[in-house]
Amino acid sequence: MLIKLNLKQAESGIAHKFDQAIKISENIGLPVVVRPSYVLGGRAMQLVNNTKELEKYLNEAVEVSNSKPILLDSYLTDAVEVDVDVVSDGKEIEIGGILQHIEQAGIHSGDSACSLPPYSLSVEVQNEMKKQAIDIAKELNVVGLMNIQFAIKDEEVYIIEVNPRASRTVPFISKAIGNSLAKVASKAMIGKSLNEQKFSSTLPKGLSFVKEAVMPFDKFPHVDPILGPEMKSTGEVMGIGPNFGEAYAKAQKGANKILRRSGVVFISVKNSDKKYLDKFVPEIINVGFKIVATSGTADYIEQLGLPVERVNKVSEGRPHIVDNLLNNEVDLVINTTEGTKSIEDSASIRQSALRNKIFCTTTMFGAFAIIDAFKSNEENWTYSTLQEINK
């Protein structure tokens, strides 16, 4: 279907044997996202960066066989993920909503915060996604609901997956637009057209809606709170505001995440994320934060000519960053990692932040969203019920 419609998809393959999985990964190029074909919720899904990690995954995490194949997808580094929900009566097709994920593609859609409307996508990209969604709905003869997950990289639109069913985003969009997509779709399935139902997906004017995932980490303090392809969230909240920053800040508060607006920020990021520090570090300093960082990140920040205090990694001896966290000497943690060993080595940092209720983000996209949140003045926030917004 994608070939027929001339739509783009990241390179992928299906493996029924160990050796076949290795060969596919070599052909499409690492890193790849691997997952069993027979699970939901991202269970046992993993981002692997090299052949050694893939071999470990195949040996320890899953069984590969003819009846239980493994799916491998090329990982689109730094891509923006987008959910698009569509409702159709078989003739007329409408876009219910376009939700831009805050965390980059590769984080499970159930765990990523989302913005409705999109907060940084160009009009051209949004129009292209709408066109592709409508073309796919026509090709599949959809009557009812359909969800498409897109990835946007360098202004190019890629299909991640298409689900001809309701998705977890439907209730959120329905609350925002004041129109139940499930109800509209159900009536469409029994023959009532969208036109007869006078369906509209128009958002209330001048408002942004942000979904934030609610995590169960408070109940499981020894679990690593790092986000990845496997879903960990157990709920979600909605933040509403006149702009993305305020809506995002309210969503964090609703999810019981405490955003301290000044103090000390600890930054330790993977090499591929260091380029983002050129913009992020000056902005977080302007907000009112002092910076502490481990050696590699501190070297990069010093090269920018910006102030930074060095702190030891746990492996470098005490006093180290975990001591700082446990002594409540840090107010915000920015920690991105790459590779199994790096994730394991830095787990104590994220767990210590969790235990001390220190806000921790494990993506740079999430870090920039925090900057937007800090730009909103909580003293000026207003609150409205959904009934008031959608009357």
Where do the PLM segments sit?
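Acidic, glycine-enriched active-site microenvironments
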Residues: L145, K153-E156, A166-P171, K175-V184, ...
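A conserved helix-loop-beta module that forms one wall/lid of the active-site cleft
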Residues: M1-M45, L304-K313, F365-D372, N377-E378
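Generic structural signal for residues in well-ordered beta-strands
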Residues: Q9-S12, I70-L72, I148, V308, ...
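Hydrophobic/aromatic ligand-binding patch that stacks against planar heteroaromatic rings
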Residues: M1, I24, D85, I136, ...
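Short acidic loop-to-helix transition motifs that present clustered carboxylates
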Residues: A15-Q20, E53-L54, T77-A79, S272-K274, ...
